[in-house]
Amino acid sequence: MRVPLKLKFYNFISKFIQQGKTPNFSMDAPKRIRKGEELALDKLKKYLSNNNIEANELLIKQFPSGYSNLTYFLKSSTQEFVLRRPPFGVKSLQGGHDMFREYNVLKNLKSQFAKVPDVYLYCDDSEIIGAPFYLMERVEGYIIRPNLQQKDAPKKEIIQNVSKSLVSSLVELHNINIEQANLNDLGNINGYIKRQVEGWIKRYNHSKTDSLQNMDFIASWLIENQPLEVKGSIVHNDFKYDNLVLNKDDHSKITAILDWEMATIGDPFMDLGTSLGYWVDKNDLPELKLFQLSATTLDGNPTREGILELYEQKSGKSIINPVFYYVFGLFKIAVIACLLYTSPSPRD
């Protein structure tokens, strides 16, 4: 998908992306808890015990990845869990920081979509650890991080299978019967594209530090070129490699999909557009490959066009205006980069 509009993004995003070291193709291991993000161990142990969860000799560590909600590893003498809570000091617990909403998505989706972790408990008492939280299954496996080098990557055939599984899983998610999943109240498809475009433009205007004519042009273009809405589906809104947990014994299989905080009812093609925005091709401009946000240039990966064709083939749907969805995905990712750049802390 060679779109002249995308050229306007490259110089912009390269100003804001801050490259950090992330794990290569390895187990996503928890680390020591970051200073200032410790949990009240005694209160948590008592609460878990009162809710029939064994908490003797409870060990707590923290998963280092992620820029929104905080994720902890809990291990007792007999069990392992993952705890999710909002960042410390966050002003609003709505939207992506709403723990009950995220818990409810996973709980209800599990019966229709096997690739979500089980959830065990939700707590709305902020007196326990300072904020609402929930416990979910710890899914062990491998995660393909953005800076994975070719020399460390799985075989070409495995990457081919994983990329196909990514698209198949996205189509499977989009085909879920919303009513059977009891998620009718998750969002509203009516006006979804308009709300998304206006919402991300608003976030950009609140976070920009310079006058960027290219971004302003793209914002206007998105407003003027919105396609007709299609039938709504459950959308993930951040569907990419490093939100997939691969089977630890067979790396070509997806065991679980993580980070559901932005899930809603929306246009499935907008969800695909975000995935395409993350998808960097080998023949893309060097500027884009510098801040690659997903390991999509490894041998075995299809191109963006290949991902689009595979989605159409597996879904049986023809996407009339793929350029719009791709440009929206790029704009959204650019705004996220801008938000991270202007935030006092990556976790605010």
Label each residue range with its predicted role.
Residues Y341-D348:
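Conserved small/polar residues in nucleotide/adenosyl-binding loops
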